[in-house]
A protein has these predicted regions:
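Short, glycine/polar-rich helix-capping loops at beta-to-alpha or helix-loop-helix junctions
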Residues: 124-135
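Short, acidic loop-to-helix structural element flanking the phosphoryl-transfer center
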Residues: 18-49, 55-62, 84, 144
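Alpha-helical substrate-recognition element adjacent to the catalytic core
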Residues: 1-19, 32
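Substrate-recognition "cap/lid" segment bordering the active-site pocket of phosphatases
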Residues: 26-27, 54-102, 106-115, 129-131
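Short acidic-hydrophobic, aromatic-tinged amphipathic segments that line or gate anion-handling sites
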Residues: 139-143
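Glycine-rich phosphate-binding loop signature in dinucleotide/nucleotide-binding domains
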Residues: 42-45, 93-97, 154-158
Length: 158
């Protein structure tokens, strides 16, 4: 809760995290067309999913919606985004020396910058274009059906 002291925050998180892990599929589904775009991309690139959600929830959601992809959520000992550590861990796990980060928030743009990789900011998610431009976003994708094409264009630049 906003303005809460650290002890209250920890108490809330102690209740929330296990609840969310057990109920994370409620009102959650891939965006329309996303699975088809990932099918195109996985033919050419390894794919990993990195989230600040609890690791158990990320793995459960990925098992349901994105089976076969490496998934990493918040784990003890690995700093959360926007620190680059989770991105580096995912890149190592999938054997990627280069990467393009796909995100829908300012935190994602900053995470990619901290990791030294380009970020493709999608405009159907959490934040709007102005929010992401305010923190330096350069690449944008407006529709899920354009995702694979946008990734290939960025990949061709490095």
């Amino acid at each position: 809760p906003e303005g809460a002291d650290a002890e209250t925050v920890q108490k809330v998180l102690a209740v929330y995290k296990p609840y969310y892990t057990d109920h994370c599929q409620i009102k959650t589904a891939p965006y329309a067309g996303m699975l088809q775009q990932l099918d195109v991309l996985k033919e050419k690139y390894p794919i990993a999913i990195v989230s600040n959600k609890p690791d158990s929830a990320v793995k459960a959601l990925c098992a349901d919606f994105f089976p076969g992809y490496y998934a990493l959520g918040e784990v003890s000992g690995c700093p959360r985004k926007p620190a680059p550590d989770m991105v580096y861990k995912a890149m190592e796990a999938i054997g990627a020396e280069k990467a393009i980060y796909i995100g829908d928030s300012e935190v994602d743009v900053i995470t990619a910058r901290n990791a030294g990789i380009p970020c493709l900011s999608v405009l159907w998610g959490f934040r709007d274009k102005a929010d992401m431009e305010a923190v330096g976003a350069e690449y944008f994708c407006e529709k899920t059906e354009n995702l694979a094409t946008a990734i290939v264009k960025i990949a061709d630049t490095f």
